[in-house]
Curated annotation (Swiss-Prot):
Lineage: Eukaryota, Fungi, Dikarya, Ascomycota, Saccharomycotina
Protein name stated in the entry: Ribosomal lysine N-methyltransferase 5
Residue ranges crossing the lipid bilayer per the database entry: none
Biased composition (Basic residues): 58-68
Annotated region (Disordered), positions in chain: 55-74
Record function comment: S-adenosyl-L-methionine-dependent protein-lysine N-methyltransferase that monomethylates 60S ribosomal protein L1 (RPL1A and RPL1B) at 'Lys-46'.
Length: 367
């Protein structure tokens, strides 16, 4: 059964938060009681994603395996490919008071991201994001709902003519979202603060082999389509051969406290954002575990507000946001929802799904 959406408002925020944290408390014996770092013991993590179930990405001990596509018959309802990524992280930078202006949480992989990848690709309940379909919306536990049409977040078949993009905010160093989800979109832009980008680029390049369904071009990563060796007297380029479609993948600095898309002069500072507008008909903004203290909430929501206005008015894009939260502080979660709904006037849906409710995470769809 597909997930449902609970439309939150200024009254149901508190009911939702109370219920979710009550569920969490009831599962305290089953769930890890930690801050959510995927693995704080190692500098290099080996993680496997495969369609055998939601296992959160099994960690390997520095044994590198390359991507191998499953022999299971292709099914657009769930992904069938397996992915194996190597993530270099920096525990020392996480605890540093000097690195990246003392904003250091992005130097390690947090568990929200692997959980989201597993759920999106392999959970049957996440099918609306893979197929593009109507989803039932309720306005509360006892309220009869309506249906909301969702565009595809990812296209497993490659047959959809629509051009879709993903803009990732607060990517951190791992780079696993672009190299996995990049297989199923046309444009992917991964952003974070400037001090994070070099390690993010390194991890993307390390795992570029996981882009098995796409040819990747990137200005920021200096990737161009290769030229095929001449055959006989003919010069044949890769672009002229029938093969994989192309992914535009970019890595860019985006400071939530400094972005100003209302000033047209600053648009030239963000060519990667313009790339999404110029190449896509729909965009999902993805932000995993970026709301963990109250000081980040306003800059994040202001950035979303600007992006929504600019991409919709300038390029007429379908605009949706997926926010993943590791449920730590109940006060921070409540404040985020209050500000998003009441102060910034976003439409916010809780994604109601059993797999998610049995975890320490929650996902919100924002429009």
């Amino acid at each position: 059964m597909a997930f449902k959406l609970w439309l939150l408002d200024e009254e149901t925020i508190y009911e939702h938060v109370f219920e979710r944290y009550t569920q969490l408390e009831g599962q305290s014996g089953k769930l890890a009681q930690d801050l959510g770092i995927q693995d704080r013991r190692g500098g290099v993590l080996e993680i496997t994603f495969e369609p055998s179930g939601l296992e959160g990405g099994r960690k390997k001990k520095r044994v590198r395996r390359r991507n191998k596509a499953s022999s299971v018959e292709e099914d657009q309802n769930v992904a069938v490919d397996s992915y194996h990524v190597s993530v270099g992280q920096s525990i020392s930078s996480l605890h540093s008071s000097r690195d990246n202006g003392n904003s250091t949480t992005g130097y390690v992989l947090w568990s929200t991201t692997p959980f989201f990848i597993n759920w999106l690709l392999y959970s049957t309940s996440a099918a609306p994001f893979r197929l593009g379909s109507q989803v039932e919306v309720t306005c509360g536990s006892s309220c009869e709902g309506h249906m909301l049409e969702l565009p595809r977040l990812i296209d497993l078949t490659g047959a959809d003519r629509g051009k879709r993009g993903i803009l990732e905010l607060g990517a951190g160093i791992s780079g696993i979202l672009p190299v996995i989800l990049g297989n199923f979109v046309d444009t992917y832009v991964s952003t974070d603060q400037k001090g994070i980008l070099n390690k993010l680029k390194d991890n993307i390049m390390e795992n570029l082999s996981q882009l098995t369904r796409k040819r990747c071009i990137s200005r920021s990563l200096r990737l161009e389509l290769p030229t095929v060796e001449p055959v006989g007297d003919a010069d044949i380029t890769a672009a002229s051969l029938p093969s994989k479609s192309t992914l535009h993948l970019e890595v860019a600095a985006l400071d939530w406290e400094k972005i100003n898309l209302q000033d047209k002069k600053t648009h030239s500072l963000h060519p990667e954002l313009s790339l999404i507008g110029e190449t896509c008909s729909s965009v999902y903004v993805i932000a995993m575990d970026v709301i963990y203290n109250e000081y980040l909430i306003d800059p994040f929501l202001k950035t979303l507000k600007q992006l929504k206005h600019w991409l919709q008015t300038t390029y007429n894009l379908q605009f949706h946001v997926l926010v993943g939260i590791h449920l730590r502080s109940q006060e921070v979660t409540t404040l985020f929802l209050e500000k998003a709904i009441i102060e910034y006037d976003f439409t916010v849906y809780d994604i109601v799904d059993q797999v998610i409710q049995e975890s320490r995470f929650n996902f919100y769809l924002i429009t």
